[in-house]
């Protein structure tokens, strides 16, 4: 099982090109199921979850070719309408085949999901929405089994904001008969990116980027070409690493306007920031000031950046309160950060972080995707050697992280 070996050694300096967003690429790949035509994608990140999704689509009969950051999909021969447990258990996003399969083929069997163990993340909103659109759904033997001759447009109000739920129902609605209105829809940039691809494929969607999506169903969708949006969480992770190490870093291939809350918090911590159309520069002249924040749905502070900011706060001046409102059980990195010398106490859904002047290297264990990123940041500023075990979590969401960090001065390597 691979590990990272890190020697904390000073500031990150240079340039990093940010990869395409995992959380946009996965639903966009599944959207290939909605048409028998060819869908061509660029800027697809080289990640374990992407490879798992392609494997799942191929098992269904999809032709899927991967060439660097380019993926070509053709769904003309899709004939297996099932997502098996072996693949779904490793990646919750497999649930995203449910809507497209029911919409185009009238049937789907999808195993109940797995993925990172950070809270319940129920799929009941997906099921409720599809039922409102006329699907008959049963759950038996660990599978969601959905059937519908043709989905019918409906008004769907989800009880909570759900990103994958919005994406699943949006894809299903594109081929439904009549008008579907999705109320309380997720507004994440990755949802917007999916919607923009669907429009290129011939879908009729209004309200893109808002919490109310109105979809006029069409008979069929056609092929299209699309470039996946930049990964705002990868960008934020590298910015936190630069801030923690008192670095000077330029990120290329990013969209600063989808990172507003993260950039605001970095400024509050003392970072000097410059932005252009597709780049961000961060320079950190002195030790960070502790920043308190509360996670919430976009456009508020993203839960996927909570752990990385906690690592920055761990070596900041002062005390920060970090409140997690999206997922329960998302403080598993606290124990590991404390092993490195951090002073963090958890009180319910809030962590109180007392900044310390320095951390010291130790053996730690990654527990989920973003927790592993926080440990990398902590390792970069810790004295001596840090070894992070179970980095397969990290590989699910970061494209060659060690190569990108090494190129800007980090002493980090992958060991078996």
Swiss-Prot record:
GO cellular component: cytoplasm
Reaction(s) catalysed (UniProt annotation): phosphoenolpyruvate + UDP-N-acetyl-alpha-D-glucosamine = UDP-N-acetyl-3-O-(1-carboxyvinyl)-alpha-D-glucosamine + phosphate
GO molecular function list: UDP-N-acetylglucosamine 1-carboxyvinyltransferase activity
Family annotation (CDD domains): UdpNAET (cd01555)
Gene3D superfamilies, sorted: Enolpyruvate transferase domain (3.65.10.10)
The protein's Enzyme Commission number: 2.5.1.7
Alphabetically ordered keywords of this record: Cell cycle, Cell division, Cell shape, Cell wall biogenesis/degradation, Cytoplasm, Peptidoglycan synthesis, Pyruvate, Transferase
Subcellular location: Cytoplasm
A Pfam entry, by short name: EPSP_synthase
GO aspect biological process, one term: UDP-N-acetylgalactosamine biosynthetic process
Pathway given in the UniProt record: Cell wall biogenesis; peptidoglycan biosynthesis
Record-annotated active site: 116
Function, in words: Cell wall formation. Adds enolpyruvyl to UDP-N-acetylglucosamine.
NCBIfam families registered for this protein in UniProt: murA, PRK09369.1
Family, similarity comment: Belongs to the EPSP synthase family. MurA subfamily.
Protein name, entry field: UDP-N-acetylglucosamine 1-carboxyvinyltransferase
């Amino acid at each position: 099982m691979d590990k990272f070996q890190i020697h904390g050694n000073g500031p990150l300096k240079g340039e990093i090109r940010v990869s395409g967003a995992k959380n946009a690429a996965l639903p966009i790949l599944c959207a290939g199921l909605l048409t028998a035509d060819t869908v061509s994608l660029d800027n697809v990140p080289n990640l374990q979850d992407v490879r798992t999704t392609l494997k799942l689509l191929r098992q269904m009969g999809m032709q899927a070719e991967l060439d660097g950051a380019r993926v070509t999909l053709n769904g003309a021969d899709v004939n297996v309408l099932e997502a098996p447990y072996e693949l779904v258990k490793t990646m919750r996003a497999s649930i995203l085949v449910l809507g497209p399969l029911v919409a185009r083929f009238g049937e789907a069997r999808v195993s109940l999901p797995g993925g990172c163990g950070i809270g319940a993340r129920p799929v009941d909103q997906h099921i409720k929405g599809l039922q409102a659109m006329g699907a008959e759904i049963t759950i038996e033997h660990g599978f969601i089994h959905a059937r519908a001759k043709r989905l019918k447009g409906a008004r769907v109000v989800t009880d909570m904001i759900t990103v994958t739920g919005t994406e699943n129902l949006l894809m299903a609605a594109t081929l439904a008969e009549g008008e579907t209105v999705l109320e309380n829809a997720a507004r994440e940039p990755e949802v917007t990116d999916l919607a923009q691809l669907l429009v290129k494929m011939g879908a009729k969607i209004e309200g893109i980027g808002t919490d109310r999506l109105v979809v006029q169903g069409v008979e069929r969708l056609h092929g299209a070409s699309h470039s996946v949006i930049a990964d705002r969480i990868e960008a934020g992770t590298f910015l936190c690493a630069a801030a923690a190490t008192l670095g000077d870093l330029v990120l290329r291939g990013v969209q600063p306007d989808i990172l507003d809350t993260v950039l605001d918090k970095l400024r509050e911590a003392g970072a000097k920031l410059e932005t252009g159309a597709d780049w961000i520069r961060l320079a950190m002249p002195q030790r960070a000031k502790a920043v308190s924040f509360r996670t919430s749905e976009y456009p508020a502070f993203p839960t996927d950046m909570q752990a990385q900011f906690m690592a920055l706060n761990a070596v900041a001046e002062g005390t920060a309160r970090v409140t997690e409102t999206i997922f329960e059980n998302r403080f598993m990195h606290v124990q590991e950060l404390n092993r490195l010398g951090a002073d963090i106490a958890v009180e319910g859904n809030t962590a109180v972080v007392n900044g310390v002047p320095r951390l010291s290297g130790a053996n730690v264990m990654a527990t989920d995707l973003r927790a592993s990123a926080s440990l990398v940041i902590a390792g970069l500023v810790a004295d001596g050697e840090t070894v992070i075990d179970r980095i397969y979590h990290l590989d699910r969401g970061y494209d060659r992280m060690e190569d990108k960090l090494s190129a800007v001065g980090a002493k980090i390597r992958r060991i078996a």
